Amino acid sequence: MRPAALNTEVSEARRHGGFEDEQVYGLVRHFPTDERYALGDQHRRAVVSIPSNIAEGNGRDSKSDYARFLSIARGSLFEVQTQLGLAERLNYVTVSEGLKESITRISKMLYSIIHKLRT
């Protein structure tokens, strides 16, 4: 059984974990046509993976499984961050500071939950 405080943190992470899907999907529309099906597709898959892995981990029976899925979600978040940086360096898009801050905030939230599950 998970403590209520941890469930609250997870609910918040799930809510914020889907923050960027609409924003990233919108950014991908500005990619050159040939990149929409390469880098753009990779962006979309990574973005969908974040809340999906949070939800799947929440449904697991053990703390270690739960932490593993949250770790996968955090890895996908870093993947999105890296891909957005690349798209920005290639001048495909301009990534807002708000989006960058949201990624950092969610990463910290996930790290905190993972740490609590593992201790």
Residue ranges and their predicted role:
Residues 1-119:
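Amphipathic alpha-helical assembly/interaction segments
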